[in-house]
From Swiss-Prot:
One cellular component (GO) term of this entry: cytosol
Stated name of the protein: DNA ligase
Gene: ligA
Highest taxon, organism lineage: Bacteria
Transmembrane segments: none
Keywords (A to Z) from UniProt: DNA damage, DNA repair, DNA replication, Ligase, Magnesium, Manganese, Metal-binding, NAD, Zinc
Cofactor dependency: Mg(2+); Mn(2+)
Organism: Thermobifida fusca (strain YX)
Residue ranges of the region described as Disordered: 1-27, 216-235
EC supergroup of this enzyme: ligase
Described function: DNA ligase that catalyzes the formation of phosphodiester linkages between 5'-phosphoryl and 3'-hydroxyl groups in double-stranded DNA using NAD as a coenzyme and as the energy source for the reaction. It is essential for DNA replication and repair of damaged DNA.
Amino acid sequence: MRNHGPGSERKDACVSAPDPTFSDDVPADVRERHARLSQDLDDYSYRYYLGSPIISDAEYDQLMAELRDLEAQYPSLVTPDSPTQKVGAPISNEFAPVEHLERMQSLDNAFSDAQLEAWAHRVSAEVPVDAFLCELKIDGLAVALVYEKGRLVRAATRGDGRIGEDITLNIRTIDTVPLRLDESRYPAPELLEVRGEVFLPVKAFEQLNSRLADEGKPPFANPRNAAAGSLRQKDPRVTASRPLSMLVHGIGAHRGVTITHQSQSYELLAAWGLPVSDRIRVVSTLDEVREYIAYYAEHRHDPEYEIDGVVVKVDDVSLQRRLGSTSRAPRWAIAYKYPPEEVTTKLLDIKTSVGRTGRVTPYAVLEPVKVAGSEVEFATLHNAQEVARKGVLIGDTVVVRKAGDIIPEVVGPVVEKRTGTERPFVMPTECPECGSPLGQQKEGDVDLRCPNTRYCKGQLRERLAFIAGRKALDIEALGYVAATALTQPLEPAEPPLRDEGDLFSLTVEQLLPIRTLVLDPDTAEPKIDPKTGKPKVVSFFANQKGEPKKIVEKLFQQLEEAKKRPLWRVLVALSIRHVGPRAAEDLARHFRSLDAIAQASEEELEAVEGIGPTIARSIVDWFSVDWHREIVEKWRAAGVRMEEEGADDGPRLLDGITTVITGTLEKYSRDGAKEAVQKLGGRVTGSVSRKTDFVVVGANPGSKYDKAVKLGVPILDEAGFEVLLTQGPEAARAARLSEDESVLS
């Protein structure tokens, strides 16, 4: 959610620019730029408030920063009407206006560690701070609830900070908002004004958009817009049909209760039955604040709601009063903003690429833009139906999203910015790599596929790159350029590999003559050499003297290591459709050898936990193809492992045991811990349930730890994990953490 907003007056969807004091020391071009920025920011904020923004939060923040810089350089430009001095949003005439009991302020932002440190030093220089409260900054809609003698009497949007809109009827439809406070532990105060954030959980947002698409209605761009649109419905029944939720994060006006610390207020709010986040932490140093920020930067998608940063507050309320506020924000709090995950940019073109299983996928060619900390030029569009559903046209300004390590995707168009020159995308009818006619694998498929699985060089390149990946045989030296060199070299005319079966039979003599294009792994398009402006060509395996580069020795060493990988990794490396790591692990644990899997019937495959009819049919179909079986035999002849370790040794120590691993372990990487369990016959899953036997916790465990405590699942620290691996489940249960022990203490 933005921490800034437009003014309270609006005429014809556009606010008049502020009338700054015209002094001789302000150049005319600066005054003009200030007026333009002020007008634009007010307009952008109004559209944001309505749930239909036309620029991203990141772009808004950049413009606001520019305006602040101008006003810092020329203080005479600062007026009460400047966007830098205002809070919230304008009041529409669709809801009754209501005055807040206490002004709902915004927050100042920190976009870097240096800005966070500067804030902390300013605060500590004025008051003796001994504790900070850290909480997640929910990307939702700010509201205020008013309770009188424990009964909800009013709810309002933030509005301009002084006057909001009465949304009481709509708020009453949200299940998590109590209509009466719970007084079983503490009596309800005479008056209580509660501040919080209304949001739409991510899964609920996806379901809502799917339903809207089925009804032929335009989808929402993101959960924040969906929450705003849902909460501002004239008909409360529409709001009730949307699974909105709320978390409260502060108290405004109050009578009949004494608040000494921010953290104490949260304890009271929770006791009264109000929804409070379970991810709040009170810390004593700035370094601990940094640790909290860093943890949720990495685990940004653990919560059920979207976040865009961390709010840091001075915990002591008496110190908050001493620090006071500016006209728009408290001095005792700051919002540390994470790099934006959504930005707007130009959709230059839509092209297609072929994947390892033959699926031909449209992708967006974008005007380069920075999102989530990295520059993005391409984004996935999944399939032709998805392009149509999103309503994007070539030439559109589009919203692009990149969440963590997830591949960037185009969310949708900014329709208001269309010029009439945009054009629709037409899905090609031929493979972009080999020219084979595209078709559906079965009736009703949304994907078009290239059927030329054996001879399409594009598919082979993608399969080879996949084999080298961490989820398969983990051959670091066999990257995307090497995969291209081995399957589609410019020289020699005949590639060293005709299929992946030959991978373990490569020789140095085959590699040295190779010259190849350098392709982009996201698009398979040639990369351009900035010096020549032409496609980049390299001699990948040989130096200028024609001698092997170090990469050659490394490649052959890693190929030998790959032969010893666990059976499940070999199964994944075969690129059988629908068989990912989880299914492969289940199959390897059950059948113990690749031959047994190849010979199993559909019924026998479906009998394995986690294997359904789609996966079973896909496996049977794959092994029925002659050249697929030839790949297996070539690998077997080269010495690739085809059985589970100890396949003939009978039952193993952790047979039937399901484990979840969370947090950072000292002796094991996440994959290493997982494989240690699997070698002993155990299963590692990604979620905690009543069927989970153990949860292993390291440093900074996430919500899985909390769920394990709630469900009573045995929790092991790293020492207990060693007991599990060496002595088995019975001994591990005896080594579990007791209820009064905590990995978080």
